[in-house]
Amino acid sequence: MTIWVDADACPNVIKEILYRAAERMQMPLVLVANQSLRVPPSRFIRTLHVAAGFDVADNEIVRQCEAGDLVITADIPLAAEAIEKGAAALNPRGERYTPATIRERLTMRDFMDTLRASGIQTGGPDSLSQRDRQAFAAELEKWWLEVQRSRG
């Protein structure tokens, strides 16, 4: 079981939560990025550097993740592919994607893309709040408890 992070777009404060969690859980944490990352020294934390390019990091995460893994991403198509493989998916704001919710999120994403392509300014997401950080940490902990229960 591994936690995979779409690290190029992951906020640093979320990475810090993940570093601490990987140590506490003794769970492999892999940060996939097309740029160099500095991570704390740990036998549980590693980086995977990929070439720059559209969806290169996403494709590598999809290729390597397995059922039971956790993928941290705000990229909805990546989350959908991870879920199809049996992995869990969580965004940096603490929203856990499920097979039931991912279809709705994909539809909304496509709709927003259409609006932007037609010249309508849709704005971006709000900055990450303390509440978002707490929601992320709580959902990460919830996933970890599910993993422990499934192991017996």
UniProtKB/Swiss-Prot annotation:
InterPro entries to which the protein is assigned, alphabetical: UPF0178 (IPR003791)
Origin: domain of life: Bacteria
CDD domains: PIN_YqxD-like
One of the Pfam families matching this protein, by short name: DUF188
NCBIfam families, per the entry: PRK00124.1 (NF001095)
The family this protein is said to belong to: Belongs to the UPF0178 family.
Protein name: UPF0178 protein YaiI
Organism ancestry: Bacteria, Pseudomonadati, Pseudomonadota, Gammaproteobacteria, Enterobacterales
Gene name of this polypeptide: yaiI
